[in-house]
Each structure stands twice: as structure tokens, then as C-alpha cells.
Amino acid sequence: VSAMHGMNTNELLDAVVEKFGPDQKDEDDIDAIRIAVVGRPNVGKSSLVNAFLGEERVIVSEVPGTTRDAIDTPFQYDGRKYILVDTAGIRKKSRISEATEKYSVIRTLKAVERADVVLIMLDAVEGVIEQDKRIAGYVHEQAKANIIVVNKWDLVQKDGQTMNKFDEDIRRELKFLAYSPLMYISALTKRRIFKVLELVDFVADQNSRRIATSELNQVINEAMMLNPLPGSKKVKILYCTQIRTAPPTFVFFANHPEQVHFTYMRYLENVLRKNFGFEGSPIRLILREKKNTDE
């Protein structure tokens, strides 16, 4: 082990953590929102975690890839309970060994899977790069509620249009996260960091929202009258229902589901968002076959 050069310190820390044994799940944790903070190395994940906790709970260094996973850490803010699922970060392969890369990626992916809400951190100075897209893409593929958190906002030269320009750039680069809210912060100065937690509460509520079947079908039927299914008049969506939350998942029953184009389903998703919100939450739409008795 070399403390100066960081040689083998990752393995040492892992050995120390293992001595603690598995963390026990407290009954109070049931009501807590589990938050995973993800992003590329040195984007400010550890600084944000420490700012939330008000202490140096996570090891921080200027050298990318030196943060090690902490045990899940519960904390409270404004009467609400949270659990931070800390991550090792997804590192560039050129900077670390292949074995350590695989190890850190697996731990990050597991953290995402265990989270209720994921904070996708970006660097305001460097902007969106390919590594950010890959991380955000995985969060989206896992259908996890998420917030895009742009850190180091204090280092950006600003004018009246700066935030609008950043919004446009991020939306262009991360088109698949059009539903995700944006928050600009400085983890170092703690500017707006607790606004992030307020947004976490909101997004978690949106992600667990359930819509009554009658209300749902009224909205969908009106949307289909305004913009009917293209193609054959024989193709019909008969009704829909919500089968789960987190993420909100809807089943649409059609007499010929194979003939319903994905662009029309995207239209229906936009209708759901316009009427019911679901901000920060992915939506899953499923088509199933049900024969029309009128046929």
C-alpha cells in the first residue's frame, strides 16, 4: 500500500468495509426515499453527498476514481427520511485497470437498481460528454425516476441567457431524458442543494402516482378522437389500465396491437404526461391483444 500514490488503497478500503459486515435494514427505512448519486469521475458526487450529510462522510480527492463506496447512509431533512446509496462512479478505462473498471461499474449499476430516485450529475464547466450519455442512458433503460443535477454552477460565467442555453444544450444531448427536471447547483458552496431534495420528494411522488382507470380512459379516448389511429379503421385501442407504479406502467389493449405504430404510442405517452405529469419519471407503455367483440 502506498498512501502517497494511492496504490492498493482501493483494495484496503474494501477490506475494511467488509469487516463491518452487511448493513442491516431498519424498519424506519421503509418510508425513506433511496437516492443514488451517479456521474463520471470528479463531477462532484462525493461533495454533494457530504453537503447533504453535513460532514466528510465520503473520502474526497482531486484525483478521479478515488471515492470508495460508503455504507448506505440514512439522513433526514425537513422531516423527510432519505437513504443515500453511494457509488464508486463510472471511470474512464484509460485511467484504471480493467478489473477495477468492471468492479466500479457493477457497484454503480447495482446502486441505480436499488434507488428510488437517481441524481445524474453533470459538470457545468465541461458540459455533456459521451460518458455522461452512457450513464444517463443506463438510468433511463432501468426506468428509474431521475433528476439531472448540473454541478459547479458557481464556476460558470453568466448572463441573462446562460441558463436557457445550458437547458437547450443538455436537452439536445440527452433527448431521451426529456421528462427529467434540471437543477443547477454548487455542491462546494451548498447553493441550492436542498432544493434538490425538495425535487427528489416531488419526483418520487410522481413516480408512485396511480391514475384511476375511468379517468385514464376518458383522457385516452379524447386523445384518440382528436388524433385517430392512422391506417385501417379496423385497428382499435379498446381500453387501457395502469398495472404498476415506479415506474408508472400502462397496458393498452388493442384488437391488432402489431399494427399500432410506435409513433402513436409516443403520442399517447405525451398525452399522459400532459394530463397527469409524471415529471422525472419514465413511463412504460405495453400493447396487448384483446379481440373486439364487434368484429
Give a label for each model feature.
Residues 1-85, 93-106, 110, 114-120, ...:
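C-terminal-of-GTPase-core extension/linker across diverse P-loop GTPases
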